[in-house]
């Protein structure tokens, strides 16, 4: 079994150390096959700051203030919350996807599949107005996935078109 120290030594495809979640794992959440994308864990690296950066450093530098103003205690708490409880996945640019947890705004993580395809890396994230992603294609919606289809006997006579 890996120790916490060994987890801390795990690095992303660019050599940046992964951040541990509140349970001591490098996996912050999961994208499953049912979500119409390759199944893999969601991971966050320390990353790089700057406009071409990614990961925790990039989000802290560019979006920490808005995340705190939205009621989160930290960027770390924001990432963990959205990675665990996103309800919609939308198609982004250049092979990225948006994981959204909606309320008055969309709490959003931008993720991309790693080169090896073994994890989803958090590229960026923040709090965005709902119109930001309004026209982006929906890949998965938890509300649609949880709607059971009616059994054959559950159809009303007027709905039976056979």
Which sequence ranges carry the predicted segments?
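Ribonuclease/tRNase effector modules and their secretory precursors
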Residues: 1-162
